[in-house]
């Protein structure tokens, strides 16, 4: 068994999401907007819903407009349940 599988089983199944940073004004915290797309059961129209979540950014490296990957984690504060894994694309 690989090392990644062992660590994932110890931590449990954690959701990894991708979104854009909309705020970085707090210390060690970023606000990421996540988009979810679902198809309506009857009319088959694609519905988009947006949700803003707070994520932990230890080094304060993410900026507004960056495309980031975040991972679900234990509650770090009242509102913070995600942590920054990587910056996929920096804002222009």
UniProtKB/Swiss-Prot annotation:
SUPFAM superfamilies: Nucleic acid-binding proteins. It comes from the Bacteria. Gene3D superfamilies: Nucleic acid-binding proteins. One of its GO terms (molecular function) is structural constituent of ribosome. It holds the Pfam family Ribosomal_S17. Signal peptide: none annotated. GO terms for biological process: translation. GO terms for cellular component: cytosolic small ribosomal subunit. InterPro entries: NA-bd_OB-fold, Ribosomal_uS17, Ribosomal_uS17_bact/chlr, Ribosomal_uS17_CS. One of the primary rRNA binding proteins, it binds specifically to the 5'-end of 16S ribosomal RNA. HAMAP family: Ribosomal_uS17_B. Part of the 30S ribosomal subunit. Belongs to the universal ribosomal protein uS17 family. PANTHER family: 40S RIBOSOMAL PROTEIN S11 FAMILY MEMBER, SMALL RIBOSOMAL SUBUNIT PROTEIN US17M. This is Small ribosomal subunit protein uS17. It comes from Corynebacterium efficiens (strain DSM 44549 / YS-314 / AJ 12310 / JCM 11189 / NBRC 100395).
């Amino acid at each position: 068994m690989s090392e990644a599988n062992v660590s994932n089983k110890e931590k449990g199944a954690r959701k990894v999401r991708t979104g854009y940073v909309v705020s970085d004004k707090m210390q060690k915290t970023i606000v990421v907007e996540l988009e979810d797309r679902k198809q309506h059961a009857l009319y088959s129209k694609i519905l988009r819903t947006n949700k803003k979540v707070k994520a932990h950014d230890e080094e304060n490296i993410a900026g507004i407009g960056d495309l980031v990957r975040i991972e679900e984690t234990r509650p770090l504060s009242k509102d913070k349940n995600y942590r920054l894994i990587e910056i996929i694309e920096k804002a222009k």
